[in-house]
Amino acid sequence: MTERRKMKKPENVWFLLGALAVLAMGIPYLILGKDAIFVYHDQLDGEVIAYLLQARHLWDGSGILPEFMNGASRTALTMPAPACVWLYRLLPAETALACMQVAGSFVGYVGMFLLLWWAAEDSEILSGRKGTVGFLAMTVGCMYAYLPFLPVYGLSQYGLPMLLYCVLRLRERDRSIRERLLYDAYVVFFGLNSSLVLSGFAVLGIWAVWEIIATLRRKYSAAQGIAWILLLLTYLLENGALFLQIFGVGESTVSHKAEYALTAVSFWEQWKTNLLQGGQHSVDYHGWILLIAVFTVIAVIRRRAVDSKRIFRSLAISCGCIVFIATAAALWDSGIGVSLRSGWGALKGFQANRVLWLSPCLWYFALGCCLLLLLRQLCEKRCVRNVILFTVTMILTVTTAEQILLQSNLKPNLQKTVNREYGAMSFRDYYAVDVLDQVQEYIYDNFGERPEDYRVVSLGIDPAAALY
């Protein structure tokens, strides 16, 4: 079977319904404006400031940000999604951040939907159940889109399913030149809207291992290799100045910490945490998904068929990568990892445990594969056992979806929209917008000074407020 089979109704309907459900999350942001609620840790207190200052000095040709640390190097504030600086150049900060949230979630939804459609594509049995396959892909895609990733990181997490889909399509020999160019364009787009040090290094590393294994098995794909090079070059161009500084070439201004205190943790405790919970900013509520994966494998392991080979292989590889990632991250933070890193100079502070940022994409791809396998089994033989298995799996999936919705970035904004007295700290509250507007007005009325002519010192408020 080939991908020439285009999505038709009713799967088209499911796709559009899911897309609308994801885009609808932007409505509360439009209503609330500066009263919208965003996670402020590692977002409003840091990365948003990086975007604002870099956008402010986008064309001045200076290597210094005068507002930051009394004139620090531009490399001290590296943007996690460099192309998004244009949003902060053209739009108010709260609108730009809301756009990053909606756009990131939408790309995540579309990517996961297409990824699961690709997995189910070679199954003859599922080809007669396109509507149900579309519904399952829509469900898992929406779940991934609503995960509470920080939008300030661009496509570093939300963009992974689409990247994986494009890479898998590039491997197929019957792709047209136009299709290959589109897939390559997304690879570059992903690089421009993600960070090398957050998830990019892990993507490049695992992808390189994939290509090496494919070469050893004589299944090397030149199209995939070219795409890998494109992503690498994109990251090198984005981070060239920082790399030169790290290796002592060019400017001597220190923009990052030079001293680090590394503390080792228990390998097994960290491995268990990585596998069952995830890492910082990569918590994805996959507890029930792990259970679903276990009993799905038990249910279908003896009934594997050529008809579902791609789905089962995708599930197996996803689970294998999840375990590998959890192990690698635990080793990095363990006594062995800390001992090895101690002699690495500036690189010893590199957070390679961020490889865990790839895990949510793999967990939800695995969930989709489990649902497809159980659906295929149910279509093949409608017995009580298969009906119960599929029903229980759907109940656990809905339970996970409910948990995601309760923890999503949408929930507090819905509550704020309904009840303006809702107590969570808003964008306006965090940056003390009203207070600083009064300060600005007072200084202008009494001294004739405009904001570009003076600096605000933070006394009793978060430094980010003054920089904003």
Residues covered by each model-derived region:
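Start-transfer (signal-anchor) and selected internal transmembrane alpha helices
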Residues: 1-29, 131
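Soluble catalytic regions of membrane-associated enzymes that act on cell-envelope
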Residues: 403-468
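Membrane-helix boundary/interfacial segments in multi-pass membrane proteins
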Residues: 95, 147-155, 311-312, 320-375, ...
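Membrane-interface junctions at the ends of membrane-embedded or membrane-associated helices
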Residues: 1-10, 119-128, 169-182, 212-223, ...
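Membrane-embedded helix bundles of polyisoprenyl
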Residues: 106-119, 129-171, 176-216, 224-246
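Membrane-interface coil-to-helix junctions
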Residues: 22-112, 153-154
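Signature aromatic-anchored transmembrane alpha helix within multi-pass, membrane-resident enzymes
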Residues: 131, 135, 229, 373-408
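Periplasmic/ER-lumenal interhelical loops and adjacent helix-loop junctions
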Residues: 236-302, 353
